Regions:
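Short, flexible loop segments at boundaries between secondary-structure elements
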Residues: 127-130, 188-208
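A C-terminal functional module that forms or caps the active site or interfaces directly
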Residues: 136, 149-193
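Short, well-structured alpha-helical segments in soluble
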Residues: 34-49, 150-164
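Conserved beta-alpha
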Residues: 75-129
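N-terminal glycine-rich anion-binding loop in soluble enzyme alpha/beta folds
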Residues: 1-38, 105-106, 110-144
Length: 220
């Protein structure tokens, strides 16, 4: 915001941070109903505080995005929307995706991207296990190691060999581990792109459009 407006300006924010330990317990039990209700309640608190736009700053919880979005009367910006717009602008249609097991296996992000002309390529089972474990056992606890970085690089390299044109960092913690130049293809960080789009909304008041590719199915 300051970079665009100048001076001493900053983004006016209302933040509601949930206890991830509770969320992790619900995730381990597959209790998405509890997660949905809890996040709907938090969204309503933000709306009551005067928020003009709400962002769910996590990829995994977007499995219940639609339920949360319909529970409030202000717009919500899907975390994948700015990433899809960036991929479309770059002319990319087939990309590797790394995230939690839920994001990689449950299909909700796969469908969201595919409907907009982007095919997500997921790691194999061993790769998904490794990516997920590093997120939950290390990154969410602030642990960043070179060993885990190499594992991620190998997983991405395998997907690039299969035709991935870029990699989507589909978990907000992965940017702690990987930086531009760590892999051979462009990286698109959902967290960073989400923040940029929200910053633009704060500056100009224009809600980002929902990118829809002219070819709404991608079966390549």
């Amino acid at each position: 915001v300051r970079a665009n407006v100048g001076g001493q300006h900053s983004a006016p924010l209302t933040l509601d941070s949930v206890d991830f330990a509770q969320m992790a317990q619900w995730l381990s039990r597959g209790d998405w109903a509890e997660i949905s209700v809890a996040l709907q309640n938090r969204a309503k608190v933000l709306e009551a505080s005067g928020a003009q736009c709400i962002a769910l700053c996590t990829n995994t919880m977007h499995k219940v995005f639609d339920e949360i979005a319909t529970s409030v009367n202000v717009p919500m910006l899907h975390i994948a929307t700015p990433t899809i717009a960036a991929l479309q602008a770059a002319g990319l249609t087939k990309v590797a995706f790394l995230g939690t097991r839920y994001s990689m296996e449950d299909g909700f992000l796969d469908v969201y991207f595919n409907e907009r002309g982007i095919r997500l390529m997921m790691p194999d089972l061993a790769g998904r296990d490794a990516v997920h474990s590093i997120i939950f056992d290390e990154l969410v606890c602030g642990v960043v190691t070179d060993t885990s970085r190499v594992i991620y690089q190998r997983v991405i390299a395998d997907l690039v060999e299969q035709g991935a044109q870029a990699v989507v960092l589909g978990c907000t913690e992965i940017c702690l581990l990987l930086s531009n130049g760590d892999v051979a293809v462009p990286m698109f960080d959902t967290a960073s792109l989400h923040i940029q789009a929200l910053g633009a909304f704060t500056v100009d008041g224009i809600f980002p459009s929902n990118p829809i590719d002219s070819n709404t199915s991608n079966t390549d």
